[in-house]
Swiss-Prot record:
Keywords: Acetylation, Heme, Iron, Metal-binding, Oxygen transport, Phosphoprotein, S-nitrosylation, Transport. This is Hemoglobin subunit beta. The modification Phosphothreonine is found at residue 11. Heme b binds at residues 62, 91. It holds the Pfam family Globin. The modification N6-acetyllysine is found at residues 58, 81. GO terms for molecular function: haptoglobin binding; heme binding; hemoglobin alpha binding; metal ion binding; organic acid binding; oxygen binding; oxygen carrier activity; peroxidase activity. Red blood cells. PROSITE patterns: GLOBIN. Heterotetramer of two alpha chains and two beta chains. Disulfide bonds: none annotated. SUPFAM superfamilies: Globin-like. It comes from Alces alces alces. GO terms for cellular component: blood microparticle; haptoglobin-hemoglobin complex; hemoglobin complex.
């Protein structure tokens, strides 16, 4: 999936990411851009407008939790299916999340990283991260297959 150089670039760059900020924004943008995903978060309170979603404390908190799991997964780039096995089981068997949502969130995460880091998030780094988020989405969807 990733070369040794790509893995090194991904993990080095990730050290600069403020997980709480980026996670909250990524999940918030997912809920705004793809509003049908909100059905999994109805218990989060007011999600009626983009502003409400982006300032919702529960969205920010869960976004941080999502990126904490992503951060842990980056330590296991050679075994993403193993790293995300329990989360795949939870999202498939208990939460019944459409696995397409994992791909959407990964793509939104790449957008948010580009927004936060500008030119520092080079096309090469974007390509590396696209591989990672695709791998994570596939790992999370593994239980569905």
């Amino acid at each position: 999936m990733l070369t040794a150089e790509e893995k090194a670039a991904v993990t080095a760059f990730w050290g600069k990411v403020k997980v709480d900020e980026v996670g909250g924004e990524a999940l918030g943008r997912l809920l705004v851009v793809y509003p049908w995903t909100q059905r999994f978060f109805e218990h989060f309170g007011d999600l009626s407008t983009a502003d409400a979603v982006m300032h919702n404390a529960k969205v920010k908190e869960h976004g941080k939790r999502v990126l904490d799991a992503f951060s842990e997964g980056l330590k296991h780039l050679d075994d993403l299916k193993g790293a995300f096995a329990k989360l795949s089981e939870l999202h498939c068997d208990k939460l019944h999340v459409d696995p397409e949502n994992f791909r959407l969130l990964g793509n939104v995460l790449v957008v948010v990283l580009a927004r936060h880091f500008g030119k520092e998030f080079t096309p090469e780094l974007q390509a590396d991260y696209q591989k990672v988020v695709t791998g994570v989405a596939n790992a999370l969807a593994h239980r569905y297959h």
